[in-house]
Amino acid sequence: MSKLTHFAVLSAVGFTALQAAEVPAKPWLVIADWQTRSAETVNHANPVSGTFGRSRSGTEVIWATPTAAVDFEYYRYKNDFTGTIQGSDQAYGHTTDLMLTGFKQWDWNAKYSVQTLYALESAYEEGVSLSRGFRWGFGGAARWRPDAETDITLGVMLQDRFESGVLPIPYLKAVWRPCQAAEVELRATGLQNGLIIRGYLTADRATRVDLSVMYETLTFRLADSSTYGSRAVSVGEVPLRIGVTQFLERSGTWFVQGSFEWVAFSRHSFVHAGETQGVFQTAATWGFSARAGARF
């Protein structure tokens, strides 16, 4: 799954992080996204060699209220291989990720709530149908807000994974706000696992700086192989990312985001008919991303 990036339901749950102070709540968020990564040498891919690079473009539409959210994402990944790895069973073509995620919350009182979490995704290589690239996730969580500075959500999701079937995945999102100008989030979902630190540079929260370190995963269904049968690829990465979000006017409608990332670790595991048959890693790589969006 993307984000990616990022697991989309987490973007929806964390939508309030984009709310500028002194601006009425706006339930809709529309984002255009672009990202590029440098091409780097692959290793641990004997007997083949070469380079791998990736770029991404897409859009995201979120509807969010304090007790419910729905997030739709479309991303197109261009995967570029060079050298002898190109055309081997350790390479694949361009991929597409369509995802619908969301949550619904029921409040017990001001401190305790329960949530249902859901995700539908089609993640597939060119030449593979939407239905064959389909998978899903469903689960529940409990939310505890002991004070104004602390917000903890803990649960479990059943996730259909191309490479491993259906697995129970822990879900954790813990946010601590020590002051109006700072926020720390610990996130563990199986798809995104790590720490995010946010700093607000202005009193109206119109300018935000993010620093994050994550272990993130992507999984795509690949075209069948005449030798191995069904195929999938699971990508695990550890990006260190710093970004800036800037609202462009006092109404809090239009904003831009930019980020730089250094990916210390990236590993591609290929599953053929349920068994891991190939792996490669890339040297440390860097990348840029840019987003523009509006709230209304």
Give the role of each language-model region.
Residues 51-57, 92-98, 130-138, 166-170, ...:
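Residues that define the transmembrane beta-barrel architecture of outer-membrane proteins
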Residues 75-88, 189-288:
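Outer-membrane beta-barrel translocator/channel fold
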